[in-house]
Amino acid sequence: MSPLLLITVTRAQSPQKQSGPAQKVIIIMLDGFGEEYYRMSDMPTLNYMERHGLFKVVTSLMPSVTNVNNTSICTGELPEKHGITGNSFYNTATSTEEFMEEDSLVLAPTIFERAKGKGVRSILFSSKKKTIGLLPRGTEEAISPETASQKWIDRIGPAPDIYSREVNYWLMKAALYSMEHDPGIGLFYIHTTDYPMHTWAPESQESKEHLHKIDSFIARIIKAEPDAMVLITADHTVKHKSLCWDLEKACLSRNTPIKIAISPERDKYFKHHRGFGGTSYIYLRDTGDRSAVAQTLRGLKGVDEVITKQVAVQRFHLMPERIGDLMVLGDSTTVFGDLDTESEALPATYRSHGSLYEAKVPLFIYNATHPPSPDFFSYNYKIASWLYQDLTRSSISHSE
């Protein structure tokens, strides 16, 4: 296939011309796919895309967890606009911790809604059922192996367990089936699970086998849709962590009690990470406690920074109504979550994310006819933000 990507574009063109009404779009979000996973694996298809398309290592959004980044990619907006600030959040109206899994929580239009407005049919495939609950708006169909209908089981076969690498292969087969049997679909969004990355380091043979297989599926996707643009990025990488703090217990034992500590990493996939992540939102009992609580937190081993809500909003573009009074940032080997004791040494096999140390990911743009300038793609969420727009936005031709 002759690559069509033009990487010398210096100004934004009409977004309708950029995407081209006839050119299909395939977005693949490889969950947990940091650059080290790419470089340590045999992935000839991605190697080809890197050489013949646009490739960059870009910044992902904080907290470096799936919901924040997936929603940002799917809306082309920052969390301050779409409202998703973690896999979980503290609902101040009900005073309870809740999972962010409902589409009503997403406050910005999805790329699927934008595409639908231009007459483009779209389909969402995700290994994780939480994604099809969070981001289905505008899709013709949203498919997850966790909730696969009998129709899809008849087509692809029984869905593997969510805690497996095989579940990603099932997902790719389902996407390929759709490409081969429904030529009217113009936008595909494919989101894998990072269970293999939580389980295996990038140098492990199991990880290399998994990613080589994923690469072979991407080759088949390009063969099935040779005229489509293919956009690939990730939400975060995954790294070993050696220490976890229960910040509620740690603060209580140091005479600076708090209302609650929320791990934005926490979701229903407990086996992935036990709910531990590299950031935490701290809700105070009283605003007058801020200084004392922050001092306690800064004294804990493995805490890089403790910042106020105002600083977190400005620095990470978060929605203030959905984060705590303080935000705690861990170092490269420390995570936060609920424990039976105030801290726990984690085993050598434990891997997670959520911190700044997992917020660099690869980005590939291949076969796009008129993309924006390469400088535009400074963050992962911008990979498709320029598509299906009604008006040319000044941000399309400038990096942030």
What are these regions (language model features)?
Residues 266-398:
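Active-site neighborhoods of enzymes that stabilize oxyanions during catalysis
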Residues 36-81, 123:
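Short, structured active-site-proximal loop/turn typified by the sulfatase FGly-forming signature C/S-X-P-X-R
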Residues 77-202, 292-293, 298-302, 384-396:
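His/Asp/Glu-rich, glycine-adjacent segments
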Residues 33-34, 193, 200, 236-238:
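Catalytic metal-binding/acid-base residues of hydrolase active sites
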Residues 26-27, 45, 210-257, 328:
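Metal-dependent active-site segment of extracytoplasmic phospho-/sulfohydrolases and closely related
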